[in-house]
């Protein structure tokens, strides 16, 4: 598990460094990528967890013993986060929660004509899977902006996938936002696992 993100001081970067930071690869032909993603999805659907371990080894160059993050991993991650960072995360949580609570829609019951009622009933999705990108830009803000609205909406089960190694910040944010299960798996294989389910996910 990584401890921190790379910090770039924009004002200290040369023009070339800034251009490199802002550049994105150009993808003209997506057919090879689509073919590979279809294979990954098919493998996850048929092989389950074994496909997740295989693709984590191939793409992330990590051989995992377990894709599910343990309670001990969460405790260790929390111990690595300093008080200043915890306070900043809590401020962000409070702000996001305040915003999304104001969006909460209650059930509507409207009499459109005498004796004729229309009703809008709002029900949460029972189970949601969150995907948090990793790699060069693991965003703990994505955890907050997905998990908090899901919790406010009343989703009973919230699970999360992120490529390994998952940063301590992402683990800590997941824990305090009420994510019940965290899996260290990324890419198309994570999305397929969330959609189809595996032995573990």
UniProtKB/Swiss-Prot annotation:
GO molecular function: histidinol dehydrogenase activity; metal ion binding; NAD binding
Co-factor binding details: Binds 1 zinc ion per subunit.
Pfam families xrefs: Histidinol_dh
Gene3D superfamilies: Nitrogenase molybdenum iron protein domain (3.40.50.1980)
The keyword Calcium is annotated on this UniProt entry: no
EC nos: 1.1.1.23
The reaction(s) this protein catalyses: L-histidinol + 2 NAD(+) + H2O = L-histidine + 2 NADH + 3 H(+)
Record's keyword annotation contains NADP: no
InterPro entries: Ald_DH/histidinol_DH, Hstdl_DH
GO process terms (BP): L-histidine biosynthetic process
Keywords in alphabetical order: Amino-acid biosynthesis, Histidine biosynthesis, Metal-binding, NAD, Oxidoreductase, Zinc
Cofactors, names only: Zn(2+)
Any one of the GO CC terms: cytosol
Domain of life the protein comes from: Bacteria
Pathway: Amino-acid biosynthesis; L-histidine biosynthesis; L-histidine from 5-phospho-alpha-D-ribose 1-diphosphate: step 9/9
Subunit structure: Homodimer.
Homology family: Belongs to the histidinol dehydrogenase family.
Protein task: Catalyzes the sequential NAD-dependent oxidations of L-histidinol to L-histidinaldehyde and then to L-histidine.
Full protein name: Histidinol dehydrogenase
Species the sequence originates in: Buchnera aphidicola subsp. Melaphis rhois
């Amino acid at each position: 598990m990584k401890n921190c993100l790379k910090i770039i001081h924009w004002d200290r970067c040369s023009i070339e460094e800034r251009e490199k930071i802002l550049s994105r690869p150009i993808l003209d032909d997506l057919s090879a990528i689509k073919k590979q993603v279809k294979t990954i999805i098919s493998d996850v659907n048929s092989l389950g967890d074994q496909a997740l371990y295989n693709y984590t080894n191939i793409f992330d160059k990590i051989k995992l013993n377990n894709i599910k993050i343990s309670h001990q991993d969460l405790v260790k991650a929390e111990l690595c986060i300093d008080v200043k960072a915890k306070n900043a995360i809590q401020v962000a949580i409070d702000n996001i929660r305040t915003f999304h609570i104001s969006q909460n829609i209650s059930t509507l019951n409207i009499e459109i004509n005498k004796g004729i009622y229309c009703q809008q009933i709002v029900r949460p999705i029972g189970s949601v899977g969150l995907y948090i990108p990793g790699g060069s830009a693991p965003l703990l803000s994505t955890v907050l902006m997905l998990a908090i609205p899901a919790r406010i909406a009343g989703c009973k089960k919230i699970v999360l996938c992120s490529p390994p190694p998952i940063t301590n910040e992402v683990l800590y944010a997941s824990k305090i936002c009420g994510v019940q299960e965290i899996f260290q798996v990324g890419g198309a294989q994570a999305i397929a696992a969330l959609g189809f389910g595996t032995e573990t996910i």
